[in-house]
Amino acid sequence: MAASAKRKQEEKHLKMLRDMTGLPHNRKCFDCDQRGPTYVNMTVGSFVCTSCSGSLRGLNPPHRVKSISMTTFTQQEIEFLQKHGNEVCKQIWLGLFDDRSSAIPDFRDPQKVKEFLQEKYEKKRWYVPPEQAKVVASVHASISGSSASSTSSTPEVKPLKSLLGDSAPTLHLNKGTPSQSPVVGRSQGQQQEKKQFDLLSDLGSDIFAAPAPQSTATANFANFAHFNSHAAQNSANADFANFDAFGQSSGSSNFGGFPTASHSPFQPQTTGGSAASVNANFAHFDNFPKSSSADFGTFNTSQSHQTASAVSKVSTNKAGLQTADKYAALANLDNIFSAGQGGDQGSGFGTTGKAPVGSVVSVPSQSSASSDKYAALAELDSVFSSAATSSNAYTSTSNASSNVFGTVPVVASAQTQPASSSVPAPFGATPSTNPFVAAAGPSVASSTNPFQTNARGATAATFGTASMSMPTGFGTPAPYSLPTSFSGSFQQPAFPAQAAFPQQTAFSQQPNGAGFAAFGQTKPVVTPFGQVAAAGVSSNPFMTGAPTGQFPTGSSSTNPFL
């Protein structure tokens, strides 16, 4: 009967122990928080797991651990467990433990678990006496509760008016007029921006009209009338397309000529009379590179001054043309080509000397300022398109005075061109068209080009290489070769040290002159203005004689230099 009573008491204690194990804070191991504790630490009164029970036995002093299901508990042990449990043990042994500052070890590592248990029980690092445990626990609870409420709960959202108070000023949106200062600043900025874009305002205006006086550098934007007009060069560059400014550096007006320093223009001596013409300086070769002893024959200084004065009248109204139209200077060029075309006196390049020297050139006066801007271009076009009557722009059929380079001397003395005719041959006249050589002997076919030669008719060349081994203009014989592009004369000493233009009286001169022989072969038919000539006449002013039929005869080129 005593055994049954003891058995009933043990069953009652076991039931009470299971009830304590079912409490929330006793459902986990006190040391490692593992669910389902199976042992009871009777030393401290806590519920632990199987692994922690073995560690607790290895401490110094070892803890007394009992199994919940395999042992029996006395009434005193049950009462001790009821007074303690995991919650009370936590307040005593982990009273000073801070979860945020103290590191919880990895309980999967047995060594770390053992070290943690030694700190906890042997060293009593976080130990709090039982009489103070409840007070410390309550303080920690209040601190943790306040911190938890401050961190976990979101603060209440309050309106802005509650923060500012009733005295806060009212905020009006889109109801008031904006201040005037931004408007003023914007208008000023627009004005400045407009000024910056004023440089494009002249694009729609006349580019040849005089612009309004402005002080900024953008006033002459896209104004081609003032392309070269600088303050210090108004006298030199005021006339647009004024071809008179080509040779003004040394005081002589040479169209296409080089300014001479100490030599007079290329003028052979004449027997008398006015030898100057309108374009005396056209194709002016006086500044050709030459040595100190090689001069182009004997020069006449008085005639050179007459020639310079005759052509210099073209630029006499240069100061007046500065205020005139920019293309008025083309009228000067037109007058050069078309002067004297109405009578029997020749045209620009072959004009005879019946009229006085100064009267040939018709210089535009101040009235050209009010003339049509493009009248000069129209007149220039009429020169090239008009039919040749008694003369054309390059030749003259007159029998009077002299050519552009002066008359050929009658006496066959030491001149640049030995004369073979008693009648002076004009520049481009029918007997001979070479400005440097008079006609001698029968001509194969007359050419109207001053720099043109006939086919197979050349016996001596003035400047280039002659075929048939005839002596050239500078006295140096050349081997027989058809004159091709830049062959012949450039292989010889172009300017020997002996006297230039030696006498070649033993040879008859070339009838029409082989000027510029080394520039290629002839084109047989076309004259400078499209007039078909004889079959043996070359149309290239810079080619020497060659057999005809090399090029088609039906060419209609109007280029005077092809």
Swiss-Prot record:
PROSITE patterns: ARFGAP
One Pfam family this sequence matches: ArfGap
Keywords (A to Z) from UniProt: Cytoplasmic vesicle, Developmental protein, Differentiation, DNA-binding, Glycoprotein, Metal-binding, mRNA transport, Nucleus, Phosphoprotein, Repeat, Spermatogenesis, Transport, Zinc, Zinc-finger
Residue numbers bearing the Phosphoserine modification: 167, 181, 362
GO molecular function, one term: zinc ion binding
Gene3D superfamilies referenced in this protein's UniProt entry, alphabetically: Arf GTPase activating protein, Longin domain
Domain notes: Contains FG repeats. The FG repeat region is required for acting as a cofactor of HIV-1 Rev.
UniProt domain Arf-GAP: residue ranges: 11-135
Protein transport found in the keyword field: no
Main location (coarse class): nucleus
Tissue specificity statement from the Swiss-Prot or TrEMBL entry: Ubiquitously expressed.
Stretch list, region Disordered: 145-193
Glycosylation site positions: 367
Protein name per the record: Arf-GAP domain and FG repeat-containing protein 1
Modified residues (Phosphothreonine): 177
CDD domains: ArfGap_AGFG1
TM segment ranges: none
Biological process, per Gene Ontology: acrosome assembly; intermediate filament organization; mRNA export from nucleus; spermatid nucleus differentiation
Biased composition annotated in UniProt, kind: Polar residues: 176-191
Intracellular or extracellular location(s): Nucleus; Cytoplasmic vesicle
Organism the protein comes from: Homo sapiens
C4-type Zn finger ranges: 29-52
